[in-house]
Amino acid sequence: MSFDVDVTVRRGERAIVCRFASAGGITALVGPSGAGKSSVLEALAGLLRPEAGRIAVGGTVLFDSLARVNLPPEARACGVMFQDLRLFPHRRVLGNLLYGQRLAPPERRFLSLEEVADFLDIAPLLGRRPRTLSGGEAQRVAIGRALLSGPRFLLMDEPLTALDDARREAIIAVIERIRDELALPILLVSHDRADVARLADTVVELRP
């Protein structure tokens, strides 16, 4: 499934121009802080309306300023993992996962809760609160919630930030398994070029 992006996104007085096409696998947006990486990811998710341009994923047009197409986030079938994870602190891990599952209509569900818990090795965490999780555990729960939403593709904003080496390796392995075993195309944002060199099939450079 391909990403086909040609958009201008505005943040305040600054226009961020991003153009790329990738054939699937893992696509990485790289660049220094302030380059607009997260803004482009939000545009794909439908959380930020581009000023102009077109976004298509797997041949489905998500946004087209000329054709006046702008699908709402819930119609884009994308799983989003935010940099701050955004787990609900008042819900246990199970509740966070079930929230993701409820976002997916039955016809889009390709993994059960049990399958996701096994795939990510988070079954022992289901009864815990997010505040009791390590960084790596919280990352896996956030990935699980995204997978349970029945996505056609995943958007991941700095999924390896603030992890020690062991937890970083564990999350890298999860991302690789999602690509290889679930065949989900992934767009990830990263500032770490070593991680990008290891993971990405396509690299898109953004400059401030």
Task: List the predicted regions and their residue ranges.
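Conserved H-loop
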Residues: A183-V189
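Catalytic Walker B motif of ABC-type/P-loop ATPase nucleotide-binding domains
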Residues: L154-E158
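ABC-type ATPase nucleotide-binding domains, specifically the catalytic core motifs of the NBD
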Residues: R91-L111, F119
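A short, proline-enriched helix->beta-strand linker immediately N-terminal to the Walker B motif
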Residues: L148-R152
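ABC ATPase NBD coupling module
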Residues: L62-G79, L103
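Conserved ABC ATPase signature
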Residues: R129-L133, E137-Q139
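Conserved ABC ATPase "signature" region
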Residues: T60-F63, R108-L125, E176-R177
